[in-house]
Amino acid sequence: GFIGDIWSGIQG
């Protein structure tokens, strides 16, 4: 995901 966001694990 984006830098430090909660979606990191989902979006890649």
Curated annotation (Swiss-Prot):
It is found in: Secreted. Transmembrane segments: none annotated. The keyword Secreted applies. GO terms for cellular component: extracellular region. Expressed by the venom gland. Its main location: secreted. Keywords: Secreted. This is Venom peptide 6. It comes from Brotheas amazonicus (Scorpion).
